[in-house]
Amino acid sequence: SDFMSYENFSTLIDKIAEFSGEAVISLSLWGESTLHPQLDLFIEKILSYSGLSVLIELSELNLSDEKLNKISQIVKNSEARTNGKEKIYWIVSVDAANQEVYEKIHGKNSSFEQSCSAVLKLSSLFENCVYPQFMRLKENEESLETFYRFWKEKNDEKLIIQKYDWFAGFLEDKKTADLTPITRNPCWHLRRDFVILLNGDVTICREELLNSSQGNVFSESLENIWQKRKTFLEDFVKGNYNQLCEKCDEYYTFNF
């Protein structure tokens, strides 16, 4: 299946709430979570725990007005958060200031206008929780200032300028600037993230695109899987980087 079932997801959220208590659940690891037919139920399940928030990243809005209004009502009806976060966050990958540049990044059949419309529509329903995002690339660097000025005024200064992630050398290097710290600090993602695939397998981090399962959340406890990760973090702190970590420059980035 291309989707995690609601039954499995519900079980997983119960486990996360017990394990962490306070967490931000990102539904958009490498794909478009707005394509999931039960997205509204997923959001409702997450928000049933006052210590959990939800993050959704998208490039285009694949949700009907009916589904959006339903999600908006779910968010409004849920309790205030106890984790210091908003109930829900939306990040829209705009990445451009015009159609020509947008097509270079998102493909010929993509629509810059629809991406901008997604930001505005979401902002009308989820006030102060929507962020247009610009990922800096060689293809769009000249559009950065235009993007920044427009959305700073249009969206009450809520926007994200994101560095390019080349997945530790798996993708072509399209970075426009080297932003890495002089001193390499312990990886934020090893310390804070828990990457779960739709079949329940857990990878060491989101940069690991190939086989590296640390366990499965549906057959093991989250505590046991988390303990397995400690070796990687301890090695990182000591400067003993594995092949993936050696090439990776995401260690200083984080969302929450």
Stretch-by-stretch model annotation:
Residues 67-72, 138-153:
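Catalytic cores of alpha/beta
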